Amino acid sequence: MANLTRVGFVGDIVGRAGRSAVIQNLPKFKREFELDFIVANAENASGGFGLTATNAHELLGCGIDAITGGNHSFDKKDVVALMDALPIIRPYNHFAGTAGRGVINLMGHYGLPHTNNAFLEAERALKGCESENILIDFHAEATSEKNAFFRLFCGRVGAIAGTHTHVGTDDLQILKGTAYVSDVGLSGAFDGVIGMDSEAPVKSFLTGLKHSFKVNEKCRRIFQMVVFEFDDGRCTDAFKIRVIDGVSEPLVQRAVKFI
């Protein structure tokens, strides 16, 4: 008999809008699709930068089993203590001595703070990993880097879910038992620029000067999650769910399957 496991992965949760979208939508989808385990990237969940203890407990209380991160993982000072007490994961290739358990959440190189090589660190992590169903959150800027990572580990892990850009991509696929999507996309403000109020980013592009980004609070929200179905370590099915305020039905996209 098939040993099926269903895992939900929620893309970058950004600010209050993202948390409320998750709290409103995740419990019903957990029941509907009988999810066994849920992972979410929450490095932007508190004001768009980092994760506080209060917000971590809030998200874990609505059904999330593990929280991943990226370049904003350490933006809030209380997160170090949280990593010792709660299922909050730092990028595995963060420098040695950094807090956190380092289960497979990796950070890319291009356009991000310097870390150890994600490709080499992933090889090292897999050698010591005894889990049957392996899901990697690859938090990276460049789709080319994510694609190269997928090609290296295709057939060796169950799923690779890209995060960081906040913009969902249309390339969900399954090849050699490995599901892949370049970016799941944010859960947060649908209006604005990658979850932030539009004014500051637009000014930055117009003037070339830095402006303080603020989370867009008065907005339509979007919730985005990919569901992976694993059978003995291989992904056999995957689909993405999008829920947007004002759109009556959830939008569902199934993975393209290749032999």
Can you describe what each PLM-predicted range is?
Residues M1-I259:
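Acidic, metal/ion-coordinating pockets
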